[in-house]
Every structure is written in structure tokens, then in C-alpha cells.
Amino acid sequence: MSKDFILAVDQGTTSSRAIIFDKKGNIRKIAQKEFTQIYPKSGWVEHDAMEIWGTQSGVMREALEFGRVKPDQIAAIGITNQRETVIVWDKETGDPVYNAIVWQCRRTSSICDEIKRDPQFVKYIKENTGLVVDAYFSGTKVKWILDNVEGAREKANAGKLLMGTIDTWLIWNLTRGKVHATDYSNASRTMLFNINSLEWDKKILDYLNIPESMLPEVKNSSEVFGVTDSHTLGGAEIPIAGVAGDQHAALFGHCCFEKGMAKNTYGTGCFALMNVGDKPVYSDEGLLTTIAWAENGKPTYALEGSVFIAGAVIQWIRDGLGLVRSAEDSEYYATKIDSTNGVYLVPAFVGLGTPYWDMYARGTIVGITRDTKREHIIRAALEAIAYQAKDVLECMKEDTGLDLAGLRVDGGAVQNNFLMQFQSDILQSEISKPKINEITGLGAVFLAGLAVGFWKDKQELKSILTTEKVFEPQKDSQAVAHDYRGWKKAVERSKAWAECYS
């Protein structure tokens, strides 16, 4: 039977998804199932690792059944996943010793504070992992499990426990324990992997007291990791041939293969990644250095910046203020006026991310006069999303010395044409919106397809990724500079507010 399809396994923070793609990049079927979010204490977030596997294997079978695709028609599987979330399990039984600790979980903040008391070690971590010391990353989460779960430390020291990010857990289960591996992109998010030597970092492992025997083998993002066990998917042994963290897979799905190419994902927040080539670039502007993907043992590096509040500001003006009935209405109101008339909205509801990193900043609306109307506030909210993206992308330009070679966009907010046009104006750069919405899944299947010869090269991938719309700058650079100065002044007003007035 001909192998006409590739299956994307897209394991996210709130749901497990499976997407079947054909050779032209068309979607045959999507299946999705949400799973339980566990909050044992304030600031703690967990997932049931067995529920993750159960929902993920379930949607894979569902996509095949309802897409009318037989398992032996699948040429390969590509995995993309929520990053940093980590699981520790028993090597013999395959049972987790504790729930998965999710990337959002802040329980290891005190461990991070302890590390930060040693500035030289903090510097070492940044220079060798590309990351800042934060509870966000996997390393301190593993330490917490070993220190707090009864018997875990002893078992780990005896070589009886394994750890892995979500991709590793899925590979382990898909192969029935035959393969314990991760890819370079996911490894680079653990705070345990040296992105220069491309090995697990012994100095950091020793500091956190994590036995190296627990760690998975690190493989290329585009490579056959192993095959599914014959009992997993209807008797078929399907190659698992592509693996990447979700934001990395999106960069690959956007075909950002050249240095200077960047993508921005507009979700609740924003994640911007720029391809910086075959050598790591370290940021002076608060960005993270990461491995985008690796092929044939050669990594491609990226800079990453995150904005905490993007699409969430539209939810706020809808649900909190009642200024619009639906998110789609925001575009209608924003286009009823020519400008915000000097009004700026800084959505620092939970502080500010890149490049400000101010946890005490708070939301601010400035420039209000007696003439300010609902439309001005709505438009200012949309413009704030674009200004924050510009903040991040300007940092990338500063760190790399590269001009932005256009911006590829995805996520829910890209359906707002006003926002995309304003983003193009404020960046003075072309914005490309692809026809396909499932860019993360597409990136995973692109990686898998290249590994098994389903597609021959990246040039063929570029022909599959078709553009729905291109936005070109329509404002002159002087007007843009004037507006951006106003944004910067507004941000200054929002800084340290909770610290000063709590």
C-alpha cells in the first residue's frame, strides 16, 4: 500500500492533537482531546503523564479512523510538543514516579534563587545553555522530583529512573520502551544541555545532583528515532522521524531556513523566533539563545523572545471591559478611526516580558482626553500587540546585526487584518500570512518527511507552504518612529507600578 500521508503528533499544554497531512501539505483529518490541568498549590501546575499518553494515543487512532487512513499508509510520524514540561518514570515498569511538572509551574523558584546567589554559575549557565536561570526550564523541576518524591533519589542513583520532556515520553511509549531519546531543540530547553559542545552539561548536572544515566540520547530533529511498536497503531511499524519543540517546529513550518528569517506566533502571548544560523548568538537584550533544530549533527540556532499578553488583551476588552462582543469586532472598531489620537494601552497585566523583564509593571492606558472614545481604546489594544512584537524584533536586530528578512506569522490573531497591516507598518517590513493554520504540525511533518524521503529537499517544502496574504508597509518611517517613541514613553509609565504603589 502506498505511503501517502504523514502523521503529526501535536502535544500541547491543554490538549493532545493528531493531524494527518498529505504530500501537498493538505490536512486530511484533525483529532483533538483536552486533558486535566492540575493545580496542587498556588503557582504549581501539573499534568497526569498517563493521561497525556492516553489522550495522545487516542487522537492518533481517531484521526486515522475518521480520516479513513490505514496505519500502513503513514510514511512517518512527526512529534511536536509543549516545551520544558518534564516527566520522571521507572525504567522497568514505565510508570511515572510523579505527575509531569508543567513549564508554567513556579514551585522551583527557591532553587533558582539559590543558584542566582552564585553570579559566576548564572553566567556559566547562560553562556553554555543559552538560557536564564528560571523555574520555567526543566532542570530544576527534575531536581525537585528527586528531592521530594520518596525513594526517587535512591532509584535515580541506582540507574532505575529515566527522565524526559514530553517528546521523550511519547517516543518511549510509542516504541514500548525501546527508545529513550529527545531532539536537540527540546534538549536545549532543559537548562541541562550544552548548546556549544552539544552534550549534556556535566557541571550543571553535578550542581543539581541529577544522574546522567537518567537522561535521553539526543538526536537530530530530522532523523529516524525508531518505529512504533506493532501493538501501538494497528500493527504498523511507523518510523518516528521528526521531533521538535512547538515554537521550533513553527519556525521550520514557516520555512525560515535562512539566517535573519523570523516568525511570530500570536496566541495568548507572542513567541518570536529568528534563525541566526549555524553559530549561537548570545543576547544582551534579554532574549534566549536556543537550538532551532538539527540535521546531520549540525544545529541551526535561534534567538527567542516572548510577550506575556497579546491575544489576551483582546479577550480583556471583550470580557473585562465589554467594549466588543467578539474578538472579530475589534477590527471593525479599530478601522472606524484614523489613529488612537495619542492613546496608548500597555497590557502589562502580569508584568512585562522581553526586553523589559519587569515583574512589577502593570497595565496602563495613557493619553486619554475628553475626546477619547471606545474605538480609541480598542485600536490602542490592537496596536499594543504589534508594538510589543516590535520591541522583541528590534532586540533581535540589535543582537544579530541582521535586518529582518520579512516576518512569517501564525496564531489566532493573524485573522485580524488591521493588526497585521499595523504590524507591517510599525516594523517597516513585509508580513506573510500562510494559507495553512496548522504551522506547528506542518513543521513536525516537514522534519519527518525529509528524514524518510517523503519530500526530497527544503526547496520542495517551500513550494508546499503557500501564502494567503502579504502585508506591505503603508506608513512612512518618520510617522512610525514618532508613534513608537510614544509607545516607549507609555511603557515607562507602566514600569514598577506594583512595587511603588502596592
Curated annotation (Swiss-Prot):
Pfam families: FGGY_C (PF02782), FGGY_N (PF00370)
Enzyme Commission code: 2.7.1.30
Superkingdom to which the source organism belongs: Bacteria
Enzyme class, first EC level, given as a word: transferase
Keyword Membrane in record: no
Binding-site residues, glycerol: 83-84, 136, 246-247
Gene3D superfamilies referenced in this protein's UniProt entry, alphabetically: 3.30.420.40
An annotated GO BP: glycerol-3-phosphate metabolic process
Pathway: Polyol metabolism; glycerol degradation via glycerol kinase pathway; sn-glycerol 3-phosphate from glycerol: step 1/1
A single cellular component GO annotation: cytosol
Origin species: Francisella tularensis subsp. mediasiatica (strain FSC147)
Keywords: ATP-binding, Glycerol metabolism, Kinase, Nucleotide-binding, Transferase
Record: residues binding ADP: 13, 17, 268, 311, 412, 416
Family, as annotated: Belongs to the FGGY kinase family.
Classification via HAMAP family: Glycerol_kin (MF_00186)
Regulation affecting activity: Inhibited by fructose 1,6-bisphosphate (FBP).
Catalytic activity field: glycerol + ATP = sn-glycerol 3-phosphate + ADP + H(+)
GO molecular function: ATP binding; glycerol kinase activity
Binding site for sn-glycerol 3-phosphate: 13, 83-84, 136, 246
Annotated residues for binding of ATP: 13-15, 268, 311, 315, 412
Entry-linked InterPro entries: ATPase_NBD, Carb_kinase_FGGY, Carb_kinase_FGGY_CS, FGGY_C, FGGY_N, Glycerol_kin
Cited function: Key enzyme in the regulation of glycerol uptake and metabolism. Catalyzes the phosphorylation of glycerol to yield sn-glycerol 3-phosphate.
Protein name: Glycerol kinase
